[in-house]
From Swiss-Prot:
It is found in: Cell inner membrane. GO terms for molecular function: ABC-type molybdate transporter activity; ATP binding; ATP hydrolysis activity. It comes from Escherichia coli O6:K15:H31 (strain 536 / UPEC). PROSITE patterns: ABC_TRANSPORTER_1, ABC_TRANSPORTER_2, MODC, MOP. The complex is composed of two ATP-binding proteins (ModC), two transmembrane proteins (ModB) and a solute-binding protein (ModA). This is Molybdenum import ATP-binding protein ModC. Its main location: membrane. Gene3D superfamilies: 2.40.50.100, P-loop containing nucleotide triphosphate hydrolases. It catalyses: molybdate(out) + ATP + H2O = molybdate(in) + ADP + phosphate + H(+).
Length: 352
C-alpha cells in the first residue's frame, strides 16, 4: 500500500496529494503537461523532497517532513523507468540488466528476460537497439532491482506508433504476471485504456479524480479529454459461455449478458470492454426480430445537452452506460431520470 499525504512546491508549481493506493495493479497518473504527474513520481522515488507531509510504502516511511526523514532513492526499493531508457552505452544489454540486480532476483533473470522478449538482445550494445527494445531493457533492469513499486514516466512518449504497438503487449503481460504495483504516467488515453486498473487525474497539482478506470472514464472529469466521437463506457465483464453453434461468446454484465465474436478465453475470465456512446440506441419496448444481438434493460440516471446532441447516462447491472441520441429522440421517448427502457448495443470492443 502506498500512502501519499504531502505537499511540495517547485518554482511556481504546488503539488498537494492525499490518497492511498493499493499494493497491486497499475495506477495511471493522467493530466496535461505541468499538471504535476512527473513531480508526483519524483517525490515518491526520492528525486525531490516534499516540504510537508509523509510518503509511506508498505509500512516503511520514505518521507516524513516533520521528523526529517527522507530516504535516499537507492534505499526506497522503488524502480523508475524514464521516458528515455538511460541505459549504460558501454555495457551490453546483459550488463545493463545485471547492474544493480538484487540477489533475490538472480534466479528470476531468465524468466524476466523471456517475459520481456529480450533474449536475442543480451549481447548487443544499446546503440544498436530500437526505441522499443531499449525501453524493454530499461523495464527489465528496473524490475531486477526487486522493487516494491515500479514508476514509469511516459515510457512510450518518445516512440513512434509502430514501436508503441510493439511495447504495449509486453506491458500488458507484465501486469498479468508480475505482482508489483505500478504508477504509470501518461497523457495517452489509449495507453491508459489498455493498461490501467485505476486512474488518478491531476490538474494544477490537485487530484481531480481517483478511482477504478471504468468509474473515472465515465465521470464528467474525463469529458474534456474525449472528443464527441470517442465518448464511451468502460465496463468490467466476465466470460459466461461460448455459443454451441455460432462463433460467439457471452459476457456477463450483472444479471444480463452481451454477445461478442468468439474469444479464446476460459469461462469466468475477467475482461474489460468499451462501448461507444454513438453505438447505443434506446427503445421503450424490447425489439422483436432484430439483427442487433445485444439489448439490455437499463434505467435512465440523467441526461445532458451537448452541442445539439443528448448524452444519456444509464445504469445497467450497477454499471454506467452512456448513449448519445438526438434531442428529437429524447423528447419522443420522454427521457427522464428513473425511466426504464432498453439499450440496443451495435458494437462492443475488448480493451483488456
Amino acid at each position: 500500500m502506498l500512502e501519499l499525504n504531502f505537499s511540495q512546491t517547485l518554482g511556481n508549481h504546488c503539488l498537494t496529494i492525499n490518497e492511498t493506493l493499493p499494493a497491486n495493479g497499475i495506477t495511471a497518473i493522467f493530466g496535461v503537461s505541468g499538471a504535476g504527474k512527473t513531480s508526483l513520481i519524483n517525490a515518491i522515488s526520492g528525486l525531490t523532497r516534499p516540504q510537508k507531509g509523509r510518503i509511506v510504502l508498505n509500512g516503511r516511511v520514505l518521507n516524513d517532513a516533520e521528523k526529517g526523514i527522507c530516504l535516499s532513492p537507492e534505499k526506497r526499493r522503488v524502480g523508475y523507468v524514464f521516458q528515455d531508457a538511460r541505459l549504460f552505452p558501454h555495457y551490453k544489454v546483459r550488463g545493463n540488466l545485471r547492474y544493480g540486480m538484487a540477489k533475490s532476483m538472480v534466479n528470476q533473470f531468465d524468466k524476466l528476460v523471456a517475459l520481456l522478449g529480450i533474449e536475442p538482445l543480451l549481447d548487443r550494445l544499446p546503440g544498436s537497439l530500437s526505441g522499443g527494445e531499449k525501453q524493454r531493457v530499461a523495464i527489465g533492469r528496473a524490475l531486477l532491482t526487486a522493487p516494491e513499486l515500479l514508476l514509469l514516466d511516459e515510457p512510450l512518449a518518445s516512440l513512434d506508433i509502430p514501436r508503441k504497438r510493439e511495447l504495449l503487449p509486453y506491458l500488458q503481460r507484465l501486469t498479468r504476471e508480475i505482482n508489483i504495483p505500478m504508477l504509470y504516467v501518461s497523457h495517452s488515453l489509449d495507453e491508459i485504456l489498455h493498461l490501467a486498473d485505476r486512474v488518478m487525474v491531476l490538474e494544477n497539482g490537485q487530484v481531480k479524480a481517483f478511482g477504478a478506470l471504468e468509474e473515472v472514464w465515465g465521470s464528467s472529469v474525463m469529458n474534456p479529454w474525449l472528443p464527441k466521437e470517442q465518448q464511451s463506457s468502460i465496463l468490467k465483464v466476465t466470460v459466461l459461455e461460448h455459443h454451441p453453434h455460432y462463433a460467439m461468446t457471452a459476457l456477463a454484465l450483472g444479471d444480463q449478458h452481451l454477445w461478442v465474436n468468439k474469444l479464446d478465453e476460459p469461462l469466468q475470465a475477467a475482461l474489460r470492454i468499451r462501448i461507444q456512446a454513438s453505438d447505443v440506441s434506446l427503445v421503450l419496448q424490447p425489439p422483436q426480430q432484430t439483427s442487433i444481438r445485444n439489448v439490455l434493460r437499463a434505467k435512465v440516471v440523467n441526461s445532458y445537452d451537448d452541442n445539439g446532441q443528448v448524452e444519456v447516462e444509464l445504469e445497467v447491472g450497477g454499471k454506467t452506460l452512456w448513449a448519445r441520441i438526438s434531442p428529437w429522440a429524447r423528447d419522443e421517448l420522454a427521457i427522464k431520470p428513473g425511466l426504464w427502457l432498453y439499450a440496443q448495443i451495435k458494437s462492443v470492443s475488448i480493451t483488456a
